[in-house]
Amino acid sequence: MTVLAALIALVGSLFFALGAALQQYEASGTAKPGLPALLRRPRWLAGGASILAGGGLHIVALGLGPLTVVQPMGVASLLFALPIAATLHGRRPSRRELTAAGVVAAGLIGLVLLVPESDGPTHLGPSGVATLLAVSGVASSLLWAGSKIASAAGRAALLATGSGVLYGATATLMRVLVDGAWNWWYLLALPVPALLALMMLQRAYAVGHFGVSFASLQIADPLTAVAFGALLLGEPLPSGIVPMAAAALAAAGTVALARTTPLEARH
C-alpha cells in the first residue's frame, strides 16, 4: 500500500503542476489578471480542475500511506511544473532552472520529513481563529505592499509568498474544522483567505517568473501552516541545524530561480 500511496501522490503532483502551469499561462497572457476575467477562460478553468484533481489524489494517498512517504511526492510538482510551463510557452527550461528547482525540492523534502508529527487534539477557539486571520491578513498585506516597489522577480516572489501565507492559514483553519471544532462563523471565514490567496497567486503568475512564484508558494504554504500549528495549536517545531540547512537550501534555490530569465522573455 505504501508504494501505491507514493504513486498516487506522484500522479497528484503531476495534476497539480499541470493546473498551475495552465493558470500561469492564462494569467500571464491577460492584461488584467483578475478573477472575473480569468473565470471566462476555459484553459484557466481546466487548470483549476486539474489542481482540484491533484488535491483529491493527495488526500487518497494520505489515506493509503504514511505522511513521510506521501508529502515528499507532493514536492515533485515543482519539478513537473517547469517543463510543462515551458512547453506551453513554446520554450525549453534551462539546465540552470531545473537545477535550482531541484535544490528547492530537496530543501522542501528535508523540511517536510523533519516536521514532528502531533498526536494531540486540534482545537482553536474564536480568539485563536481571529488571530490566525488577522496575522495572515497583515502579513499578506505587507508582502503585497512590498511587491509594488520590487523588481519583477521580487514582485512574483512576494505575491506568491503572500498567497502561500493565506493558503497556510486556510489549511490550518481547515484542519481545525476537520478535527471537529465546528462553528458556523469558522465555515464562513474559511473561503476568505482562500479567495485572497487565489487572487494574489494569479497576480504573481501574471508577472511572468513562473519558477520563482511557484517555488515561493511551495515554500510559504507549508511553513506558514507549521508556524501557525506551533503558535496557535501548540504543535512541536523542528529544531537543530538540519532543518535550518534544509530551509536555507530551499531559499537558495528560490533565489537562483529568481535570477533566471522568465519563460515568456526567451527568444
Residue ranges and their predicted role:
Residues 1-267:
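Polytopic alpha-helical membrane proteins, predominantly small-molecule transporters/carriers
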